[in-house]
């Protein structure tokens, strides 16, 4: 028996909030290679989400939502500096956990940055591959496949 159009859509969509997407987010996925993480962010698309992969100046890998929380500029064009990734438009600085470290242009006594968090996902590196986990906490252990270790 063939699937209806609606059933096919439900089973094949992997975006956030879809049945397939919510199931697949509970696994680790390869998102890049360690040697790609030089001093520039790298744009990625995983499970229907636009993301940016980078390595900060403390050698930590990070995976953030692609678009700046402030004005929606692509962080693919950001600069890796000062412990995070700085947006090229207004200079907001994000660390690998999505925490906002600096908000240039905001009043010095503003606490706005403390109430806002940028989308960020867990990453781990194994055998030169960067893996990402987009699901809810707690993340499962990253499988140690025998071909990788």
Segments the model singles out, each with a brief description of its role:
Residues 1-23:
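A boundary/linker detector
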Residues 2, 33-149:
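Rieske [2Fe-2S] iron-sulfur-binding domain
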Residues 26-30:
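A short helix->beta-strand "capping" segment at the edge of beta-propeller domains
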């Amino acid at each position: 028996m063939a699937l209806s159009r609606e059933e096919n859509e439900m089973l094949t969509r992997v975006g956030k909030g879809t049945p397939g997407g919510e199931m697949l987010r509970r696994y680790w996925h390869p998102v890049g290679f360690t040697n790609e993480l030089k001093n520039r962010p790298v744009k990625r698309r995983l499970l229907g989400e636009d993301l940016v992969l980078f390595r900060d100046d403390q050698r930590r890998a990070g995976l953030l939502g692609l678009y700046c929380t402030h004005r929606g500029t692509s962080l693919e064009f950001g600069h890796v500096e000062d412990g995070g990734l700085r947006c090229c438009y207004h200079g907001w600085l994000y660390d690998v956990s999505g925490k906002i470290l600096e908000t240039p242009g905001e009043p010095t006594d503003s606490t706005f940055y403390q109430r806002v968090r940028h989308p960020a996902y867990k990453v781990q590196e194994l055998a030169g591959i960067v893996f990402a986990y987009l699901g809810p906490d707690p993340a499962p252990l990253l499988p140690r496949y025998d071909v990788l270790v």
